[in-house]
Each structure stands twice: as C-alpha cells, then as structure tokens.
C-alpha cells in the first residue's frame, strides 16, 4: 500500500535529490514502489531596487514528501540516495496520516495557485529604516503599496511626527515591540 513519508535531505540539495530519486526510479524499475515525489514550494514575489522578481521558495527547506510502498528494498534505495539524511521517524519510518496528507496537499495547492508577497508589512506595524537619509530611524507604517513594493512610514524627528514616503520594502525591516532602541 502506498503511503506518504517525509524524507530529510541536505539543505540546498532538495532539487538535486528529487531529480536523482525520479531518474533512478525510472531507470531501476522502482516505479512500482515509488509513486510520487514532492518538493513543497511556493512562488514568492520579491522587490529589490524597484524590480519585481518571482522566485521559488521551499516551504520546508531540507524535506521532500515521497509517496511510496515501503519495503526493505524501497527504503534502502531512498536512504542510499546521495543527499538523503533520513526518513522522518529515524530507524522506523513513520507514514503521514491521511488527515495530515490531505491538509498538506490542500495547503500546497493553495500556495501554488498564486504568488505570495515576501514582505507582509501592515499599516501600524513598527519598522526600522536601514537605508537612505533616515537610516536607523524607527517608525510606524502608515501606508503599504504591495503592487509597487513600497511603503510610507511615520517617524518622530525632534518630537514631531514626520512622514517618510516612497521607501522600498528592502529599505526597512520589521521590528518587534520592545526592540525600538536597538
């Protein structure tokens, strides 16, 4: 019976391991034991210096989902693939429950259907400015323009609130409450 397993792989080798498993599966006749291999990822829009770029980001870096019929042979084949660390569960791989699989696959489908904004700045959140004339100032986001990758921030200069417009997302970082003075 086919079940889903989580396989830990070396970080930054996820695509390479997935391709190795798929290629070897076809070449060695393991297709009867390994049905599907998924590298959970989503498309994320990043804005750097005014340029919009869609990049693929791994949802769980260092992990693959493998739908397989677990036998000694199939377990050994996956385990010996270069870049594989181990199955989740260690010595005795533990299959995901049907409910977990349903939730994971639904979540992946939702994330693949669109593009996620890398920066999720919200009006009212506190940010620190890292570039430009107001570098190191901490302020509160007053407007967000996700389509342009820009925002406006209210900062206090000599006790007076001043609006800083047209900051790009990369020019600021979110600050947790209580960290304003760092």
From Swiss-Prot:
InterPro entries tied to this protein: KOW, NGN, NGN-like_dom, NGN_dom_sf, NusG-like, Rib_uL2_dom2, Transcrpt_antiterm_NusG, Translation_prot_SH3-like_sf
Keywords from the UniProt entry: Transcription, Transcription antitermination, Transcription regulation, Transcription termination
GO CC annotation terms, alphabetical: cytosol
GO biological process: DNA-templated transcription termination; regulation of DNA-templated transcription elongation; transcription antitermination; transcription elongation-coupled chromatin remodeling
CDD domains: KOW_NusG, NGN_Bact_1
Tagged with keyword Transcription: yes
Pfam families, per the entry: NusG
Function: Participates in transcription elongation, termination and antitermination.
Record-stated family: Belongs to the NusG family.
PANTHER family to which the protein is assigned, alphabetical: RHO-INTERACTING TRANSCRIPTION TERMINATION FACTOR NUSG, TRANSCRIPTION TERMINATION_ANTITERMINATION PROTEIN NUSG
Protein name in the entry: Transcription termination/antitermination protein NusG
Organism for this UniProt entry: Chlamydia muridarum (strain MoPn / Nigg)
């Amino acid at each position: 019976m086919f079940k889903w397993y989580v396989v830990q792989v070396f970080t930054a080798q996820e695509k390479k391991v997935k391709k190795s498993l798929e290629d070897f599966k076809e070449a060695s006749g393991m297709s009867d034991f390994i049905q599907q291999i998924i590298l959970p990822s989503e498309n994320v829009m990043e804005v750097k210096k005014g340029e919009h770029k869609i990049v693929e980001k791994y949802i769980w870096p260092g992990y693959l989902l493998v739908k397989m019929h677990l036998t000694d042979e199939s377990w050994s084949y996956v385990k010996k693939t270069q870049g594989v660390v181990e199955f989740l569960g260690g010595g005795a791989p533990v299959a995901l429950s049907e409910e977990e699989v349903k939730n994971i696959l639904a979540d992946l489908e939702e994330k693949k259907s669109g593009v996620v904004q890398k920066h999720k700045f919200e009006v009212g959140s506190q940010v620190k400015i890292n570039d430009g004339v107001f570098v190191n100032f901490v302020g509160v986001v007053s407007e967000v323009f996700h389509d342009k990758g820009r925002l406006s921030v209210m900062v206090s200069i000599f006790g007076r609130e001043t609006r800083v417009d047209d900051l790009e997302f990369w020019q600021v970082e979110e600050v947790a409450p209580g960290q304003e003075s760092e």
